[in-house]
């Protein structure tokens, strides 16, 4: 059970690090994937499963990093237009469509299939879900705190207005 408490401490520390803005450091997902790879490879001990897992994880990590870097650098933009199927057509409505970037993370999971997900991949996804859940809880707590402050502020404002009105009428 000593390993469980260290894992809990690591998760708490990682959550605290996620809430603090960082600059140009490797993403938490990359660190978690590397950590899980080291732990999983020691427990699995099979080179074939290691190669298969390395390729899957590097593909998914590269896809996530590509999508994240693209959205950070370029911001929201419309995708490029498709070329018309009939180049000789003039003045008419040309069949225009948009190429949408597919959700690469979902595609990787769909390609792998749920049957092929081993314990290591499930552990990686579980940890990512825990990080996301922790962020959500922190945001919910922050929202509750702001609602409490707003209620207190408006209560004080109304009280001061009533006291001011009472003093004005008394004069």
UniProtKB/Swiss-Prot annotation:
Keyword Transmembrane helix: yes
Membrane topology: Single-pass membrane protein
GO BP field: apoptotic process; negative regulation of apoptotic process; negative regulation of mitochondrial calcium ion concentration
Signal peptide, first to last residue: none
Entry GO CC: endoplasmic reticulum; endoplasmic reticulum membrane; mitochondria-associated endoplasmic reticulum membrane contact site; mitochondrial outer membrane
InterPro entries (UniProt xref): FATE1, Mff-like_dom
Function comment: Involved in the regulation of endoplasmic reticulum (ER)-mitochondria coupling. Negatively regulates the ER-mitochondria distance and Ca(2+) transfer from ER to mitochondria possibly implicating it in the regulation of apoptosis. May collaborate with RNF183 to restrain BIK protein levels thus regulating apoptotic signaling.
Subunit structure: Interacts with BIK and RNF183. Interacts with IMMT/MIC60and EMD.
Descriptive protein name: Fetal and adult testis-expressed transcript protein homolog
Organism: Sus scrofa
């Amino acid at each position: 059970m000593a390993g469980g408490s260290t894992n809990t401490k690591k998760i708490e520390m990682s959550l605290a690090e996620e809430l603090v803005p960082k600059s140009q450091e490797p993403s938490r997902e990359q660190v978690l994937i590397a950590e899980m790879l080291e732990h999983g490879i020691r427990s699995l001990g099979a080179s074939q499963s290691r190669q298969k897992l390395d390729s899957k994880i590097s593909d998914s990590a590269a896809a996530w990093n590509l999508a994240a870097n693209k959205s950070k650098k370029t911001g929201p933009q419309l995708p490029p237009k498709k070329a018309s199927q009939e180049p000789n057509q003039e003045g008419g409505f040309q069949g225009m469509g948009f190429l949408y970037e597919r959700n690469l993370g979902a595609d990787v999971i769909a390609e792998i299939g749920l049957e092929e997900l081993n314990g290591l991949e499930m552990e990686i996804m579980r940890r990512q879900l825990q990080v996301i859940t922790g962020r959500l809880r922190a945001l919910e707590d922050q929202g509750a705190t702001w609602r409490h402050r707003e209620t207190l502020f408006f209560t004080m404002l109304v009280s001061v207005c009533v006291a001011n009105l009472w003093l004005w009428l008394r004069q």
